[in-house]
């Protein structure tokens, strides 16, 4: 028994000394649940036997009722741990895609521009390999030298006709040093290349709905996301590895689960009639200065259109994302994981495979705010002209040059980006 106790204590000490992000990655690893259940049952069996043995040795002075009480106390934490992990497993299976299928073939997607601008558009044709998961050797990251995520903020709901992706950010992470480049795409871009010459002549935030309305033209389980991925790939010149569509309710719940976010607010932002999580409405005010924002305040801050322009709102969105990346502690994320995933089950859609999650968690754990660059790809610096009616046309060649430079390891300023520490005062 002493030997078993020593093994248990040693194992517990080893686990306690592991980095939290490593434990979080293990918890999210497919197949880990079965092993943890076996370990949990084995430890429970040993503790129950030790309890019974101690009771039997002293049975002359204690009654059976005390054995039942002791066994209940012994069993409770194990049952709680099993229930908690089961909840995580079920939520992960509902939110994230099935494990990836390895493949080495790609199908090129050619894009062309269809709109008629008042200024000349970029004439280059862009060919991007279709998204696949390449076979990797042991120890190699599934996405290779860099991970490109398309983060979408949607405002679909019972009072909306379809999903409008009013927040669109390309987050590119270098595998070598976890340097992050965030490219924010204005929702009013027009005259951009479109996959396979499909008939489309609207602004960028209408692409997702177009894909939903024409599922036969696009691949995958989410034709809206597939359509938007194709457009974004043509604009940035890089393959999008995965997308994440976050309903704004999920954003609110996520900020709360992580304990809020702290950031400098350069100008007071108001949101009259803001709807709180409980459905009531208030006139929300986020005052100038360094502020601790909960989920409601953060959502009002990134969605308000009362002050400034759409581009100012995009700046706020990027800064909140950078602050969350910088401040989200792995330990807090581990504790908040059940509530996070519970909130995401019905409000997040993604094609990230479950077996890739541990690698992403490990990569993002190394984020350093000094290596985070931000830019809004809007006029005047990043546009090539205007569509009649005042719609900006993206300067595709320049955008692709900036994205390539960032992924090649150029400092943010050299790639045309602004360091988050400068842009957001973090």
Features from the language model and the residues they span:
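Short intrinsically disordered, low-complexity coil segments enriched in acidic
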Residues: 2-17, 176, 399-403, 414
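Structural motif marking the loop-to-transmembrane transition
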Residues: 3, 31-35, 62-66, 333, ...
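Membrane-embedded alpha-helical segments of integral membrane proteins
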Residues: 3-57
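Hydrophobic residues in alpha-helical membrane-spanning segments
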Residues: 20, 76-78, 395
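Non-catalytic, solvent-exposed segments at the cell envelope interface
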Residues: 28, 84-426
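Generic hydrophobic/packing signal
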Residues: 52, 56-59, 208, 236
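Internal/C-terminal transmembrane anchor helices
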Residues: 60-90
């Amino acid at each position: 028994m002493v030997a078993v106790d020593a093994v248990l204590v040693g194992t517990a000490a080893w686990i306690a000394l592991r980095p939290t992000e490593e434990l979080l990655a293990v918890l999210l690893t497919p197949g880990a649940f079965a092993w943890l259940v076996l370990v949990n049952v084995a430890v429970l069996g040993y503790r129950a036997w030790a309890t019974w043995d101690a009771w039997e040795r002293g049975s002359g002075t204690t009654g059976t009722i005390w054995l039942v009480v002791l066994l209940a106390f012994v069993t409770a934490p194990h049952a709680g741990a099993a229930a908690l992990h089961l909840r995580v497993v079920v939520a992960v299976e509902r939110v994230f895609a099935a494990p990836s299928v390895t493949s080495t073939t790609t199908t090129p997607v050619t894009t062309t521009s269809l709109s008629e601008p008042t200024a000349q558009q970029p004439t280059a044709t862009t060919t991007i390999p279709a998204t696949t998961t390449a076979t990797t050797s042991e120890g190699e990251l599934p996405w290779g030298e860099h991970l490109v995520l398309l983060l979408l903020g949607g405002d679909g709901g019972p009072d909306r006709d379809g999903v409008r992706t009013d927040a669109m950010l390309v987050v590119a992470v270098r595998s070598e040093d976890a340097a992050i480049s965030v490219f924010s795409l204005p929702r009013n871009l027009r005259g951009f290349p479109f996959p396979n010459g499909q008939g489309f002549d609207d602004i960028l935030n209408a692409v997702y709905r177009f894909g939903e309305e024409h599922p036969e033209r696009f691949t995958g389980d989410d034709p809206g996301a597939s359509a938007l991925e194709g457009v974004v790939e043509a604009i940035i010149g890089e393959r999008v590895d995965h997308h994440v569509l976050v309903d704004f309710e999920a954003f609110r719940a996520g900020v709360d689960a992580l304990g809020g976010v702290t950031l400098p607010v350069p100008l007071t932002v108001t949101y009259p009639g803001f709807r709180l999580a409980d459905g009531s409405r208030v006139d929300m005010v986020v005052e100038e200065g360094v502020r601790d924002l909960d989920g409601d305040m953060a959502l009002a801050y990134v969605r308000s259109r009362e002050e400034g322009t759409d581009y100012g709102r995009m700046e706020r969105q990027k800064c909140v994302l950078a602050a969350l990346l910088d401040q989200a502690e792995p330990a807090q994320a581990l504790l908040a994981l059940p509530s996070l995933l519970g909130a995401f089950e019905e409000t997040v859609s993604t094609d990230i495979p479950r077996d890739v999650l541990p690698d992403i968690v490990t990569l993002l754990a190394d984020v350093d705010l000094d290596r985070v660059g931000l830019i809004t790809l809007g006029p005047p610096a990043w546009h090539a002209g205007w569509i009649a009616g005042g719609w900006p046309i993206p300067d595709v060649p320049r955008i692709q040059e900036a994205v390539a430079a960032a992924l090649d390891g150029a400092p943010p300023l050299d790639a045309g980006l602004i360091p988050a520490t400068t842009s957001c005062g973090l």
